[in-house]
Amino acid sequence: MSVHSKLYEGKAKILYTTDEPEVLLADFKDDATAFNAQKRGSILGKGRINCSISSQLFQQLEASGIKTHFIDSPSPNQMRVKAVKIIPIEVVIRNIAAGSLSQQTGIELGTVLKQPLVEFYYKNDQLGDPLLTRDRLLLMELATAEQVEEITHLALQINDFLKNFWQNCGITLVDFKLEFGLDSQQQILLADEISPDTCRLWNTTEADPNRRVMDKDRFRRDLGNVEDAYQEVLQRVLTAVEIKN
């Protein structure tokens, strides 16, 4: 496979076209952003770590029957993926109250929700990625009613799988963000990445609200030891996969 030209550069990855029209190369960066890119920095080794975690989780999801854009990982910080048209919706699944849910509703941080909450956000930096109702989403024609139903079903399936996987890693899955895309056959595939950048992860055996954090909140909230936390997550993922296999 040969790389052609840069197709798109986002906050965490660069996408390149290849000599295969339906295959892209995703290059994971060490760049870190928070608060809609108002805070910027770098996390040493983040690209390599997130690529490895995402690769492992995509393969586990594929084995469980969830279709993803993942093909393989030709180098530590690169992933070959199927070309998809990204649906401009960020799907957030919440299991425990934290972040904006606590801030906007007054639900106490750490409250376990009676059932998973699925939220949709418009993927638009200029507008601040606003929360959308289902009716607004349909009004804006970001997806069809059938696609919204399928995405919701997939998100809950993925949540069930990941909650159990992270639990086996000694990690609590608080909430996380997913993105989906359409392939050339108009099939919905899980895209983007699954990593400490996109998941809120707490060390299950740690009670301290700061020390338990194992995700990008360490960067957002200046908690320190960001690289160590990401590396620990990767090591636990690799161990869990090895045991499972």
From Swiss-Prot:
GO biological process, one term: cobalamin biosynthetic process
Top EC class of this enzyme: ligase
Keywords linked to the UniProt accession: ATP-binding, Ligase, Nucleotide-binding, Purine biosynthesis
Pathway: Purine metabolism; IMP biosynthesis via de novo pathway; 5-amino-1-(5-phospho-D-ribosyl)imidazole-4-carboxamide from 5-amino-1-(5-phospho-D-ribosyl)imidazole-4-carboxylate: step 1/2
Reaction catalysed by this enzyme: 5-amino-1-(5-phospho-D-ribosyl)imidazole-4-carboxylate + L-aspartate + ATP = (2S)-2-[5-amino-1-(5-phospho-beta-D-ribosyl)imidazole-4-carboxamido]succinate + ADP + phosphate + 2 H(+)
CDD domains recorded: SAICAR_synt_PurC
Enzyme nomenclature, EC number: 6.3.2.6
Keyword ATP-binding listed: yes
GO MF entries: ATP binding; phosphoribosylaminoimidazolesuccinocarboxamide synthase activity
Family: Belongs to the SAICAR synthetase family.
HAMAP family: SAICAR_synth
Name used for this protein in its record: Phosphoribosylaminoimidazole-succinocarboxamide synthase
Organism this protein belongs to: Trichormus variabilis (strain ATCC 29413 / PCC 7937) (Anabaena variabilis)
Taxonomic classification: Bacteria, Bacillati, Cyanobacteriota, Cyanophyceae, Nostocales
Gene: purC
